[in-house]
């Protein structure tokens, strides 16, 4: 798909990494770009859900390499990577491990093997020299959409949790603690839905903003992303995590393996 898009440079492409459209994320990206928290030093990210935590959940094609591809990395981890790269820049190297927590699932023919990962952990070195940690799971009981991340900078810290998606927590050097920033109409994408603060911006609104950005890009009035090329970068990262087996992988090697 990325090669096809490159062969047709006039075509607009967009992938549905909609968490990049939340007002809190947009505010965080601006704070990072403006160096409000100084030089980013470290990223800590988690994306956990529990939709596969029940061991009696029936086997499905999504649990196979041929039909479903990757497991938690493909369902959840790619979204965390999209946020991570947008905030921290390119990944240079990573070391990861994966786990299949429930090796078999019931089916009408009897127990069938689960082939793709239920969870994954990774340590990351960014091209900037910053470091990161990454975790994702589809068997984390009690977690519904815990896309949680924080950035430690030389002069502050940002903290976000998708389960409280209208809040961004900010610490600046010298502060005694964190300040809660509640998203509101000062973010244009929020104001397009509601002129009053505190009323909340939801998951579906993120998708509407995403569609608007695609339409604007087709009209030629504004660029949008991530496009297919950026999506290929995300795929290379999660496939590097899937094949690392505890060994360091450079993104050049991940490119060759993809």
What residue ranges belong to the model's regions?
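Alpha-helical structural signal in soluble globular domains
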Residues: 1-7, 31-34, 125
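C-terminal helix-rich "cap/oligomerization" subdomain common to oxidoreductases
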Residues: 2, 6-7, 12, 199, ...
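Predominantly a Rossmann-like dinucleotide-binding segment in NAD(P)-dependent oxidoreductases
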Residues: 9-14, 19-114, 168, 248
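Glycine-rich phosphate/pyrophosphate-binding beta-alpha loops
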Residues: 78, 135-143
């Amino acid at each position: 798909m990325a090669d096809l898009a490159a062969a047709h440079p006039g075509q607009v492409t967009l992938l549905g990494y909609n968490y990049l459209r939340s007002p809190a994320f947009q505010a965080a990206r601006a704070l990072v770009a403006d160096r409000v928290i100084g030089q980013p030093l470290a990223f800590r990210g988690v994306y956990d859900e529990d939709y596969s935590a029940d061991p009696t959940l029936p086997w499905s094609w999504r649990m196979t390499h041929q039909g479903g591809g990757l497991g938690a990395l493909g369902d959840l981890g790619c979204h965390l990577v999209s946020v991570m790269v947008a905030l921290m820049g390119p990944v240079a190297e990573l070391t990861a491990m994966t786990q299949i927590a429930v090796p078999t699932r019931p089916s009408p023919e009897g127990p069938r093997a689960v082939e793709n990962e239920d969870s994954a952990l990774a340590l990351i070195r960014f091209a900037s020299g910053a470091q990161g940690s990454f975790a994702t799971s589809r068997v984390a009981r009690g977690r519904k959409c815990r896309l949680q991340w924080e950035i430690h900078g030389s002069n502050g810290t940002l903290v976000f949790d998708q389960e409280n998606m209208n809040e961004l927590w900010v610490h600046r050097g010298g502060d005694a603690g964190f300040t809660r920033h509640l998203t509101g109409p000062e973010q244009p994408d929020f104001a397009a839905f509601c002129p009053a603060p505190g009323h909340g911006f939801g998951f579906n609104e993120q998708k509407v903003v995403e569609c608007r950005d695609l339409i604007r890009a087709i009209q030629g009035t504004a660029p949008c992303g991530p496009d297919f090329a950026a999506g290929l970068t995300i795929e290379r990262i999660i496939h590097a995590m899937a094949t690392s087996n505890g060994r360091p992988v450079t993104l050049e090697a991940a490119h060759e393996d993809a």
